[in-house]
Amino acid sequence: MTIVAYLNTKGGVGKTTSSIMTAEAARRAGFSTAVLDADPQGSASEWAEGAAANGTPLRFNVEDANRATLARKASNLEVDYLFVDTAPNDPAVIQAAVDVADLTVIPTRSTPADIHRAIQTYESVSGSAALLLWNVDPRFQLYKQARALFEENDVAAFSAEVPSREDVNKLWFTAVEVGSLYGYDDVFAELHGAMSTTTAGVTR
């Protein structure tokens, strides 16, 4: 099993969306997958419950966890890929997620403040980690500056990104089992390639 933790000490940067959507991308690619919701707000769990209430349940399990149960629950799950959603303001949960993860992914917007916080988070993480640009437009200067900062600071980052699309916000409480994955198929393909080889670009 490969465990991927999504974290950032800043809120509103797509951790929950990324956890659910990458899990769905993994499922579509033929892998068994699940999500551990370690955010006390329970956003991933709410997504799963809302999708089920709408008659379109997710095709993978979402289970809640906390700092005391995260490691045990992760070890008990038998899936190919496990994605862990975390809260931005709970250092104990964040560390517990990092401790069990094979790869830590830090989603971030491309604003200078977001990039600065993301790089700080990246530098504090032990083990393999990479930044993921989320809700971005490659045509804008902020995007180009973010990519340049990654290179200048020797920060590992996905070449895949999640574009800025209003439709992404409409995915909440849906099964997302059909239709576009809005770049998360590319994110998972790169992630899977990185975890399959020791020389992939998103590990350090």
Language-model-detected regions and their locations in the chain:
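P-loop/Walker-type NTP enzyme "switch/lid" segment
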Residues: 3-10, 20-95, 123, 169-177
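Conserved lysine of the Walker
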Residues: 15
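Short, well-ordered beta-strand core segments
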Residues: 82, 104-105, 129
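Inter-motif core of Ras-like GTPase G domains
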Residues: 89-112
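Short, conserved loop/helix-junction motifs that constitute active-site signature segments
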Residues: 99, 122-126, 150-152
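Conserved C-terminal guanine-recognition region of P-loop GTPase G domains, centered on the G4
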Residues: 115-134
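Beta-strand-loop-alpha "switch" segments that mediate conformational coupling across diverse proteins
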Residues: 137, 147-177, 193-198
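NTP-binding/hydrolysis catalytic cores, primarily Walker-type P-loop NTPases
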Residues: 178-204
